[in-house]
Amino acid sequence: MLKLVENVVERVSAEEQKPQEIQVPQSSIDEELKKIVEQIKARIYVVGVGGAGCNTVNRMMEVGVTGAKIIAVNTDAQDLLKIKAHQKILIGKELTRGLGAGNDPKIGEEAAKESERELREALEGADMVFVTCGLGGGTGTGAAPVIAEMAKKMGALTVSVVTLPFTMEGIRRAKNAEYGLKRLAKASDTVIVIPNDKLLEVAPKLPIQMAFKVADEILVQAVKGITELITKPGLVNLDFNDVRAVMKDGGVAMIGIGESDSEKRALEAAEQALNSPLLDVDISGAKGALISISGADVKLEEAQQIIEYVTRNVDPKAQVIWGIQLEPELEKTIRVMVIVTGVTSRYITFQEETPEPSEEEVPPVKIDIPEL
């Protein structure tokens, strides 16, 4: 058996060094199979809403997300002009005249409703829709729940991926975020919550501008990681129906990311992911988990260690799905991203809905920004 393994390794290594194109005659069945594959391919759309959401999709265009349509939505024409996307939608042209929502979620909501027809046309045919935004402002907080509700009613698996504002951004933005998150959770199948404050636990001396960039990058990694497990050829891919099974009516979800290049890199990366400050919940009751493993040369034994570690820490009845993406640029590093669904979060309590904040309720607050 060992000799067989050695022979395979030797042959594959030689083939990689001297790739040879094998000429295979094309048949009519091949053409038919290609058409079928194209027809059944999951159509995945990523919608960035508001300033932070548009920054996220702009970054996605830079790094590339295989097999996803990128849509940027904003009320601010000037900001939208700078964004790269497959499609841009300026919402609320009559209401805001392209000047933004002024940190008022109600204006963001009404702007989305005004542009409902254009938004519906953009979402037409989607199997899965990611709605991403930074909560706390006007456009993302107000418009994202409207867009998520549209997508879900149109039959798409709807996953919202959002950040919560830093405490230093003030009480008004915190109240806006609380209101928006409750509405978004009700409008989506799953809402993945990333508390920005937790980034400061990872790197307390991070400059504020860089902290926002890191928050954007985590949003990108979450959406890209899930999408490419479905769309990008990898060592182990996920079927769209696998993802649907975990994220359909998944409720609140949290994300953890870990990586290591040590001798025990697989276990260390898994431990880091589950102990990540971003994973700010007790995951023992999680109803589902999606594991994305990335590396240049992930071994079967390492994948098994990661999956077993995560499985031991969630509900025994939880549905756990996983995939492996080969990323040569990671070299000796293994990266593990874990998204746990169906968790109880202190960020969302479905009691009486918090009314949207107004100028009278939340006076301007002067915040002394600490040195980071």
Swiss-Prot record:
Keyword field contains Cell cycle: yes
GO cellular component: cell division site; cytoplasm
InterPro entries, sorted: Cell_div_FtsZ, Cell_div_FtsZ_CS, FtsZ/CetZ, FtsZ_C, Tub_FtsZ_C, Tubulin/FtsZ-like_C, Tubulin/FtsZ_2-layer-sand-dom, Tubulin/FtsZ_GTPase_sf
The entry's keywords: Cell cycle, Cell division, Cytoplasm, GTP-binding, Nucleotide-binding, Septation
Residue span of region Disordered: 351-372
Species annotation: Pyrococcus abyssi (strain GE5 / Orsay)
Gene Ontology MF term list: GTP binding; GTPase activity
Biased composition (Acidic residues): 353-362
Family: Belongs to the FtsZ family.
Gene Ontology terms: biological process: FtsZ-dependent cytokinesis; protein polymerization
Function: Essential cell division protein that forms a contractile ring structure (Z ring) at the future cell division site. The regulation of the ring assembly controls the timing and the location of cell division. One of the functions of the FtsZ ring is to recruit other cell division proteins to the septum to produce a new cell wall between the dividing cells. Binds GTP and shows GTPase activity.
Entry keyword annotation includes Nucleus: no
Name of the protein: Cell division protein FtsZ 1
Subunit structure: Homodimer. Polymerizes to form a dynamic ring structure in a strictly GTP-dependent manner. Interacts directly with several other division proteins.
Top-rank taxon, per record: Archaea
CDD domains given in the database record: FtsZ_type1 (cd02201)
Binding residues annotated for GTP, in chain numbering: G51, A52, G53, C54, N55, G138, T139, G140, E169, R173, D216
Subcellular location: Cytoplasm
Gene: ftsZ1
